[in-house]
Amino acid sequence: MSLDFTAIATQFVAHYYSTFDSDRKNLAGLYRDNSMLTFEGAQSLGAQGITEKLTSLPFQKVKHEYGPPDAQPTATGGIIILVTGQLIVDDEQRPLGYSQAFQLSQDASGQWFVFNDIFKLVLL
């Protein structure tokens, strides 16, 4: 069975940002206890810690705009994904550039989850 990593990455990214933009606390199910987030240099570990970090971000509204993700399979059967785009927070007129990398893994039941997540604003 071959892994259609590009399709999985595209579906994952659409789901992730749709959920993030509508209600960040609902992202908790995409992480596990051994997941790690690095957000602008600050690390959070585990689904609870990551959800706390994401829901504590200092904005009310956010909209992510991004191009097609780049994806590759990993040696361990996972998928690494790179996303670049812009986000608009609250009612700001100027979007902020960002880059985000995900490493997806599968749990024992075969469900995909975010093992690693790195987010960085791209300020020029």
UniProtKB/Swiss-Prot annotation:
Q: What is its main location?
A: cytoplasm
Its recorded name reads Nuclear transport factor 2
Residues in NTF2 domain copies: 8-121
Q: Name one GO molecular function term.
A: nuclear import signal receptor activity
GO annotations of cellular component type: cytoplasm; nuclear pore central transport channel
What is the native source organism of this protein?
Neurospora crassa (strain ATCC 24698 / 74-OR23-1A / CBS 708.71 / DSM 1257 / FGSC 987)
SUPFAM superfamilies on file: NTF2-like (SSF54427)
Role noted for this protein: Facilitates protein transport into the nucleus. Could be part of a multicomponent system of cytosolic factors that assemble at the pore complex during nuclear import.
Record-linked PANTHER family: NUCLEAR TRANSPORT FACTOR 2
The yes or no answer to whether the keyword Cell wall biogenesis/degradation is present is no
GO biological process assignments: protein import into nucleus
Q: Which UniProt keywords apply?
A: Cytoplasm, Protein transport, Transport
Q: What compartments host this protein?
A: Cytoplasm
Domain of life of the organism in this record?
Answer: Eukaryota
For the keyword Signal, the answer is: no
